């Protein structure tokens, strides 16, 4: 199956997260004083940073139970996904998810699909940056494509195999006809470290993690995968402007184990919607180049 079709299938599942349940209801009985939100990557990555800020806002808003981020890294996010899918559906375990949960299924790395979870809410949408080490000779996607065509399969691109960070480069290959040499790293932090150290030439970087290095001149931004330039970094062209038809964003949301009651799902959806729509939280996310996805109510 072509890469574009695989990604479309994963995004179709991600779209379900937008159907959050937010009707008013009495607080359900949840048998824990603190519920855990499993983040399936290590501390310091984009998903971890986003959800720690969101959990902080949820807790300050008086969440019952209070939430605690628990990092379960390993296997490119699959270890945490497996643990979350097997958790008791009593409201004491939630899972921070994005498309990698499905792209890993398509590549045979995991047997879990969206059907293993109850959807609570879409939270953020984050376009990717095609990043390059500062010592590379190319300064934009057009120059990168030209270089890759001259030396197919030699330019190293870092990303977790089977995850969104690799799929960005597979989409770029599909759109331009080039081939990269893919190198796997287990998470954003490891990939960023390798990119800055010139161990790899390219890396998909989320905007929250990349902007400080770009502005400091420690990382090149060859292009963004948004459909329009970003106002925070307006000089960086989109991939489409440079002749590569690639539009992509990491869609992050919250789910619960399959079988979690509708009352508990509604309870958490309301909590996350309140945090996501908070003006201070939205401002903080905007500074990190992260778009807040407003939950879509079923009764609208």
Residue ranges and their predicted role:
Residues 1-32:
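Short, low-complexity disordered leader/linker segments with a strong preference
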Residues 150-154, 273-288:
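Periplasmic-binding protein-like
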């Amino acid at each position: 199956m072509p890469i574009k079709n695989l990604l479309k299938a994963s995004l179709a599942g991600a779209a379900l997260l937008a159907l959050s349940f937010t009707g008013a209801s009495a607080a359900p009985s949840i048998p824990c004083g603190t519920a855990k939100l499993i983040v399936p990557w290590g501390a310091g990555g984009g998903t971890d940073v986003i959800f720690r800020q969101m959990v902080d806002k949820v807790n300050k808003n008086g969440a019952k139970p209070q939430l605690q981020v628990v990092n379960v890294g390993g296997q490119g996010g699959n270890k945490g996904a497996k643990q979350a899918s097997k958790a008791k559906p009593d409201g004491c375990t939630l899972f921070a998810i994005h498309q990698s949960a499905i792209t890993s299924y398509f590549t045979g790395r995991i047997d879990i699909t969206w059907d293993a979870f109850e959807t609570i809410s879409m939270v953020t949408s984050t376009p990717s940056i095609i990043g390059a080490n500062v010592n590379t000779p190319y300064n934009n996607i057009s120059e990168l494509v030209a270089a890759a065509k001259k030396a197919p399969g030699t330019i190293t691109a870092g990303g977790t195999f089977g995850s969104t960070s690799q799929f960005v480069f597979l989409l770029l290959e599909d759109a331009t006809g080039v081939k990269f040499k893919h190198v796997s790293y287990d998470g954003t932090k490891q990939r960023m470290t390798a990119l800055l150290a010139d161990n790899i030439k390219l890396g998909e970087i989320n905007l929250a993690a990349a902007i400080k290095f770009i502005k400091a001149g420690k990382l090149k931004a060859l292009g963004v995968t948004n459909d329009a330039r970003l106002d925070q970094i307006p000089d960086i062209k989109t991939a489409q402007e440079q002749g590569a038809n690639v539009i992509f964003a990491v869609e992050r949301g919250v789910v619960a184990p399959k079988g979690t009651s509708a009352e508990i799902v509604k309870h958490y959806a309301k909590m996350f919607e309140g945090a996501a729509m908070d003006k201070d939280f939205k401002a903080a996310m905007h500074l990190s180049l992260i778009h807040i996805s407003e939950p879509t109510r079923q009764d609208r």
